[in-house]
Regions:
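Polytopic membrane enzymes that build or remodel cell-surface glycoconjugates and lipids
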Residues: 2-165
Length: 165
């Protein structure tokens, strides 16, 4: 006969809960995330003085008729028409929204790209916060590295590269 294992009479090991960022507990991480986002915004602020480039911006923005019509037919066209042999309907939709707000004012397109990059950086912070069991320093460090990494510069400062954001 097989021997039965003796059950340990000690305390059961506690279940480790993954921290969750909630609206009621935002003060704890905002003091880590806000400086990261502010620094990234300041780094990209000079971009607002840039204009459109002679590369793809002419085809994606300045000469793109899809941006001018946000009617139902215009939306159908955005979601069914490739631009420069690429199919990026959400990018074209965001450029069309930009066009509706400020037509061909380059700084508004750059500002939108910066804000999209800041949102992505905040999402990286949140993701790492979840993975690191709530370590705010690690989350802030990784988010800062993501936000200022040279690999992302082209996506933020070149309007037609918004598709990479």
């Amino acid at each position: 006969m097989a021997e039965q294992r003796k059950k340990s009479k000690g305390k059961p090991s506690p279940i480790k809960k993954t921290p969750v960022i909630t609206s009621s507990g935002t003060k704890g991480y905002i003091k880590y995330l806000a400086p990261v986002l502010a620094l990234i915004f300041l780094i990209f602020l000079p971009v607002l003085r840039n204009g459109f480039t002679n590369w793809d911006d002419i085809l994606y923005v300045t000469n793109n008729l899809l941006l001018k019509d946000l009617s139902l037919n215009g939306l159908k066209a955005i979601f069914s028409t490739p631009v420069v042999s690429n199919y990026h309907p959400l990018t074209i939709l965001s450029l069309a929204l930009n066009y509706q707000m400020a037509e061909l004012t380059p700084w508004s397109y750059h500002l939108t790209s910066i804000f999209l990059h800041l949102i992505n950086t905040a999402l990286v912070f949140w993701f790492i916060f979840q993975l690191s069991s709530g370590n705010k320093w690690v989350s802030a460090s990784v988010a800062l590295l993501f936000g200022i990494h040279p690999m992302h510069v082209e996506s933020v400062v070149w309007i037609s590269e918004r598709k990479d954001l």
